[in-house]
Amino acid sequence: MHLVRGFVLVATLSWSATVEAAEPRSPPPKVFESGHTATPATATSKAPVDQLIPWLLSEDRELREIPFNEVIVRVTGKKMVACDPKNQIDERVVKSISAACDETVKRLNAPDSAIKNIARINEVSGHFEDMLRELLNATPGLNCDFPRTAQGRVMRSGYPDLRIVDLASKRVFYLDPKLYAAGSRDSSFRAFYFEPKIATNKVRDDAVHFIAGFEHEPREKSGRWNFTRWDLVDLAQFRVKLKAEFQGSNHDMYRPEAIVATSAK
């Protein structure tokens, strides 16, 4: 949503630790992702930014306790299906994912693991995605790959990371691996985000949505990472909050015409 040159409104959905009573809220201003209002601006109508700012301030800049399944439906038009432990298909897929998680931890904890010399945990995530994809795609009866956008593009960034298909039923399961440090399980810091954009949307099926959370200990002096447990989380009851912020890049800030002084060479 382009509001002011060099700035965009970013919607970030993150884990919400506290449950708050739902309150009636005013509808958001009718501003589209492109930055256009629902009707052409006139001398008496307000510009998009003039509509948006008062609404953000009145909502305390955050919307809390939003059901993530409703976000998915509104943004993508696809339903989020709850995992049913009594359903044979769900049970079979959960069992296969569990086995893949066990094997992933085993392989990436090995002394000769590819992640041994990676210093930043954020750079380890891709190895979990690749390993889970490889193992699940090799599981009889399943297909696992990176989800594609409507234009057929593979995007590694953004939610979700993996798309699993049960070949017999053609049902789809989305899987998003997350890594977290031991002791931070109850942290209120952001651990999840979803950016609602049509062009980069990767949720294109009615599906079960899973998070696979892997816990790790502090990195050892030898450079080794040790993962100690994992949990498979159904996001059907997941609630999120929306936080709006205005942001700009270095390119936006350091424009030649905006620089008023510079250090001596």
Question: Model-derived features: where do they sit?
Answer:
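Positively charged n-region of N-terminal signal peptides that target proteins for export
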Residues: 1-5
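Interdomain/boundary linker segments immediately adjacent to catalytic/signaling cores
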Residues: 28-131
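A short acidic/basic microdomain associated with nuclease active sites
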Residues: 129, 133-165, 169
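Conserved catalytic cores of phosphodiester-cleaving nucleases, focusing on short active-site segments
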Residues: 162-164, 173-181
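Domain-level recognition of nuclease-like catalytic cores that cleave nucleotide substrates
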Residues: 203-264
